[in-house]
Amino acid sequence: MALRLILGFDYGTKQIGVAVGQVITGQARELCTLKAQNGVPDWNQVEALIKEWKPDAVVVGLPLNMDGTPSEMCARAEKFARRLNGRFNLPFYTHDERLTTFEAKGERLVRGGQKGSYRDNPVDAIAAALLLQGWLDENTALFES
């Protein structure tokens, strides 16, 4: 199956950032931030995104520790990826998301956003775009014919 469009997810227990990426252009951009209750999203909202964008696959960020070992959240992020696969029959990939939230906060400031609190100014969708962009950059060989 040729991959053309991919959704990226920055998984969190309170918020989940979502981004979209196109393989042909090799570019990713943020879409939205979904609310979550203890890591569980509103699956109806996720389904609406899947129906609207019709992705060929999903990429879920893995929150690894700085030394590359799995963090406590890695198992939850992987479970979320498996649930996406089970509910929507989409292949999934995972990608190291270290420092994407930090980078996303800087990106928000560059764009003229407010420093403010993380809760009031979420950067999850930007982080999702950064991790998806990283995945696209590292996996271009998969898409070349």
Curated annotation (Swiss-Prot):
Keywords: Cytoplasm, Hydrolase, Nuclease, Ribosome biogenesis. It is found in: Cytoplasm. It comes from the Bacteria. Belongs to the YqgF nuclease family. One of its GO terms (biological process) is rRNA 5'-end processing. Coiled coil: none annotated. This is Putative pre-16S rRNA nuclease.
